[in-house]
Amino acid sequence: GGQEYGLRSGTLPLPLVVGFAKAIEIAVLNQKNNAEKLLFYRNNLLEGLLKNNSGLLINGSIEKRLPHNLNLTVLDLNGAKFHKLLKSKIICSTGSACSNGEPSHVLLALGRSLKEAESSIRLSIGLSTNSKDIKQAIHILTNTIKSLR
């Protein structure tokens, strides 16, 4: 048939549609609790990093952001070495999920220098993240920062 103006012909698989609807229902029911959990762990990560390290700048608003991410600039270190050392120890990124390895144009637009943008890191918290993960991340990041300064 020519359903969907010829874009998606064929009958929709009803079991998949029902399953998708149930998944959405569960996600919506858990959305508030999940956001609170992510925010709790993100704030613990930030507090631990700020407590143990000087020269950290928060990129973007800490209030107006999704609860699962944190983007920081680490001053006074070589960004390339920083990322290389972290690569084997912690899952993190130097930019957005769609970046091409270049310094973030968003960080540059926020007023970060090229050097600051190159020594920035994006950390994400997942639903499976726990307190042990946060403590380990703080430990790894702190030791890596101290080794490069």
Where are these regions (language model features)?
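PLP-dependent enzyme catalytic core of the Aspartate aminotransferase-like
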Residues: 105-149
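Conserved C-terminal alpha-helix-loop-beta "cap" of PLP-dependent enzymes
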Residues: 70-121
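Active-site PLP-lysine loop of aminotransferase-like
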Residues: 1-11, 96
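Localized chelating/binding microdomains
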Residues: 7, 26, 30, 64, ...
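Predominant activation on well-ordered alpha-helical scaffold segments within soluble catalytic domains
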Residues: 14-25, 46, 50, 83, ...
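Conserved PLP-dependent catalytic core of the aminotransferase class-I/II
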Residues: 28-83
